[in-house]
């Protein structure tokens, strides 16, 4: 779909298909903020009891409970009417089998992981499209070099992989005689479009960050530090471009104030 993912189309789809025996919809977006905004808009229109949210910024306990809930809702045998809105946290490790998927575009490997959360077992009869991919994404998600953008690299999706991924899906759509994408189709797209020659051609005159350059920079860094005694924090600085700060919600902090104070006092006493 040549558009940005939006609440209106998801709500419209939900309402039009309300008579289905099972209407389990998984919505996957690229940022926590997008997930939160979609949740607010969709839950306002169809009710909070039918919409749930999962992302990486929940407290450990809340996220554990939500992961249990989404796994239960996402079981093949559970027929429900529910919309789950999530980020990349559902791409791996969670065994989910939803009826429909609405997703923002990401590079192909991430996109295929998301697709695997819809009709996972391949046992559901499919008479109409069950996966909707929205090609347009916010420009701020595309990787930019540090120069002119502060001390940190901006974005986390490589422009070259984004453009080649779209080209791969367009070619598949034009050439296939089936509306079902096979595992062989996915492998062929990766091999044909995510190769060095095509990536370099896209990046030749691009102002965006170079996937090829970053790949070899990190490879050289890995060779450099192999065998060295290096701390986890240093490893993350070398290979992880996302900067975040852990925080405790105020009400959680106050509920555990005595315990936290006791631990702090024990630490101070040992110094």
Predicted ranges, named:
Residues 12-16, 28, 33, 37-73, ...:
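C-terminal helicase lobe and adjacent C-terminal extensions/tails of nucleic-acid helicase motors
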Residues 100:
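Conserved phosphoryl-transfer motifs of two-component systems
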Residues 23-27, 52, 80-84:
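Generic beta-sheet signal
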Residues 76-91:
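Conserved two-lobed SF2 helicase motor
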Residues 92-96:
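Short loop/helix-cap segments at secondary-structure boundaries that form the rim of catalytic
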Residues 1-20:
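Interdomain hinge/linker at the junction between the two RecA-like core domains of SF2 helicases
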């Amino acid at each position: 779909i040549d558009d940005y993912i939006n609440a209106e189309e998801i709500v419209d789809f939900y309402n039009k298909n309300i008579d289905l025996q099972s209407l389990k919809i998984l919505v996957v977006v690229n940022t926590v903020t997008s997930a939160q905004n979609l949740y607010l808009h969709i839950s306002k229109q169809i009710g909070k009891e039918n919409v749930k949210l999962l992302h990486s910024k929940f407290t450990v306990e809340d996220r554990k409970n939500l992961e249990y809930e989404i796994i239960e809702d996402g079981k093949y045998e559970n027929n429900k009417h529910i919309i789950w809105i999530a980020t990349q946290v559902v791409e791996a490790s969670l065994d989910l089998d939803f009826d429909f998927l609405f997703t923002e575009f990401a590079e192909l490997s991430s996109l295929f992981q998301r697709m695997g959360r819809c009709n996972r077992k391949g046992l559901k009869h499919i008479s109409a499209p069950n996966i909707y991919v929205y090609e347009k994404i916010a420009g701020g998600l595309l990787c930019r070099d540090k120069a002119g953008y502060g001390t940190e690299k901006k974005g986390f999706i490589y422009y070259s992989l984004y453009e080649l991924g779209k080209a791969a899906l367009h070619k598949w759509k034009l050439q296939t005689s089936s509306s079902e994408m096979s595992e062989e189709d996915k492998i062929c797209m990766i091999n044909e479009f995510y190769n060095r020659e095509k990536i370099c051609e896209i990046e030749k005159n691009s102002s965006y960050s170079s996937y090829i350059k970053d790949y070899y920079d990190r490879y050289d860094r890995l060779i450099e530090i192999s065998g060295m005694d290096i701390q986890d924090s240093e490893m993350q600085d070398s290979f992880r471009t996302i900067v975040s700060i852990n925080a405790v919600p105020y009400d959680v902090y106050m509920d555990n104030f005595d315990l936290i104070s006791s631990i702090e006092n024990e630490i101070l006493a040992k110094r």
